[in-house]
Amino acid sequence: VAPKDWRLLRLDFSCCSRINLEACKNLYKAALDERIPFKAESLSDFAENRPDILKTVPAFYNIQISAEDASVADYTPAFLKCTGGMENMGLEKFRALLSQIAEFSETAVVGLSARGEPLKVNSLCDYIESVLSFPGLSVLVETDGTLVTETLADKILVALKNAPARAVKKSAVTWIVMLDAFSEEKYSSMRHGGNFAAAVNAVQILGRRFPSCVYPQFTRVNENEDELEKFYTFWHETDSPSGGKLIVKKYDSCCAVLPDRKPADLSPLERCPCWHLRRDMIVLCDGSVPLCQECIGEEPAGNVFEEGVQSVWNKIELSSDGTSVSKKDKCGKCDEYYTFNF
């Protein structure tokens, strides 16, 4: 057994991506300066507390193309979103943002669902097609499923087939359908304004066209814990509409702004550097960038349409202990630091 376990850091000293290349370059220079032996154990130990190695370029951009919702989950009240009245992100602005992302990160996952229902925009297919025009980018759509139709799914499938091959071994289009329940009764108590039958049907529609790329999602809270086993048992079967794919997501209290409703504490015994500060960037409809997903209604780190992606990203500083330089008090209340997106 190794004396120390670095697996939680997911260190990768290869140069197969921009995010790893920059980490390796920074590690090499710093190790030379500090006279660190060029051995895996020594380099891992050294890299563990180096912000310039742990945080290089974003791997996941979660973009708010729509500030509207189709339904509202019981565990994320709409008032927390603080984007009421904001206009949707226009397609031309979105495409300009993608160009910056592709240049800065080279390879990344682009989410379309930050604080809003992406299917509320006109022609979601055009947004997805724009992402897929960059070989290094793939797209994630998280939806409540109520607006998914056969026609829309067919159009997106055509866009996928016409897109250039991906530069990385990652699904070009991934779908998450928020269900949060196994029964219609429980669903109705969890999601206000939703439609259980339509959401389940969305998994079927998408699963037939995007096999192994559709994930029904269950956000685990005290109120639906009694249906977790049935949800898992059904959707985990390979003959289910999702082909056995599913996500059980932890509840987020938004740094204790919301009540603690999680049935179990899954946080590690020792705190690790925050994955979201290291790898994620959220961009709202107006181009403003929250410091992290937990910063709701606070002063943004910057605006990508005014300052550029790289400039704003560099403002989000990571300390040597893996927390935010400017928001240490908030980080101390947060238990999302160990959850990993891409």
Cite the ranges covered by each PLM segment.
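Canonical Radical SAM [4Fe-4S] cluster-binding loop centered on the CxxxCxxC motif
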Residues: 60-93, 104, 292-296
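Hydrophobic helical membrane-anchoring modules
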Residues: 14, 20-56
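Short, small/polar residue-rich loop motifs at catalytic or cofactor-binding pockets
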Residues: 274-278
